Amino acid sequence: MPNIKSAKKDLRRSRAAAVRNRAQRSALRTAVKKARVATAAAADHLTAVSLLDRAARKGLIHRNAAARVKSRLAKQAAASAA
């Protein structure tokens, strides 16, 4: 356990951020799974893409990881539409 006041505050902030990040990452994964399962639901695809962009912008996931998932979702959506 930290003894210094600033270290205690840093630990509090770190724990709060971890909880927040866990919730956002869970919502992101859920949206991506819904988009994969949905055959022709454009709304699910757009929601997943929006969440991926936001997560990459905030540093929750790497921007290349977001681009990779978006690319695979688009490829799958195009294949199911054709």
Curated annotation (Swiss-Prot):
Entry keyword Ligase: no
Keyword annotations from UniProtKB, A to Z: Ribonucleoprotein, Ribosomal protein, RNA-binding, rRNA-binding
Name of the protein this chain belongs to: Small ribosomal subunit protein bS20
Single Gene Ontology BP annotation: translation
Organism: Gemmatimonas aurantiaca (strain DSM 14586 / JCM 11422 / NBRC 100505 / T-27)
Gene3D superfamilies for the chain: Ribosomal protein S20
Cited function: Binds directly to 16S ribosomal RNA.
Family (UniProt): Belongs to the bacterial ribosomal protein bS20 family.
Low complexity: bias regions: 16-29
Cellular-component GO terms for this entry: cytosol; small ribosomal subunit
